[in-house]
Amino acid sequence: DKEYFEVATRGVWRQIPYTQDSEQILPPSLLPSPEVYFATCLQDKEVWPIWQYLEEYDEQTLFSVIEILYDHIGVYNYETDQFENEAQKEEFAEQINNILRAYKEGYYLEPTNGFIMQIPNGALREQLEYDGSDLPDSVYEQLATATEMYYRFDANLEQKKKAINILADILESEREEVKDTLNAEYEVPKNEHDKLIFGIVNGYNIRHNRADQKNDYSKEIWYDWMMQYY
C-alpha cells in the first residue's frame, strides 16, 4: 500500500504540462523488467511475481529476494525531485528482522551492507554498522566486499578465506603506518607485530597454496578469529 517498490518496478512518470501525455523522468531499477531481473540474478525463472512463487522458494532464494528488495526499496519525492530510501530501508529492515530472528537459529538483515547473516553479537554488530566515512572510497568498497563475502548467510570456507585475504591486502597497502600505530598504541615492537600479522595469512594457506603452508587447523574457528583480528 505504501508503494515502496513502485519506482523499482515502474519508474517515475509525470504529466507533461498543457498536454494529456506523460513522460518518464526516472527509469525503473529492476530493468528490463522485474521478471527478467530476478531470473537473471538468481538464475531461476520462477521468482517474480513473488505472490505466485513464494511457496516454492528455498531458503537461498528467499533470502536473496529479500536482499534485492532491500537494495531497490524507496520512493520519489516530487517536491525535491529526489529518490529517497533511507527511511524506507530502515522500516523494511526492522520488519524483516522481526521475522528473521525467529527463523531457525535466528537471522539478521544487516542494514549497512544489505545482506542476510546469522544474528551477530553486539560487538560484531557494532563493527558492521561502520559506514566508512573516514576511509577512501576504494578502501571502504574492499572492506564492504570482504564483510559481505564472509558473513553472508551462504558463505563457504573458500569465500571466507578470500574475505580475509582482502582485509590483509588492505593492511598491506598501509603496512608502514600500521607498524607505527601498533608500536605507539600497544608498545609492541613494530616488526614483531608486523611479522605476526602477515605471517598468519602468508603461512596458513590464506594467500598462498604451497606445500609448506599450514593447513591442518580448525578453519571455522580460526577464520572467525582472523576476520575479527584483521
Go through each PLM region and give its residues.
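Alpha-helical repeat scaffolds in large eukaryotic proteins
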Residues: 67-70, 74, 151, 171-175, ...
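Alpha-helical oligomerization segments
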Residues: 165, 176-230
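Long, positively charged binding patches that form subdomain-scale interaction surfaces
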Residues: 108-191
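Charged interaction/catalytic cores of defense and host-pathogen modules
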Residues: 1-99
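Helix-loop junctions and short alpha-helical segments
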Residues: 67-142
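Residue-level detector of well-ordered alpha-helical segments, enriched
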Residues: 57-65, 162-166, 197, 226
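Helix-start/N-cap signature of alpha-helical segments
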Residues: 58, 156-159, 163, 219-222
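Short amphipathic alpha-helical segments and their helix-coil junctions
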Residues: 34-53, 138-155, 204-214
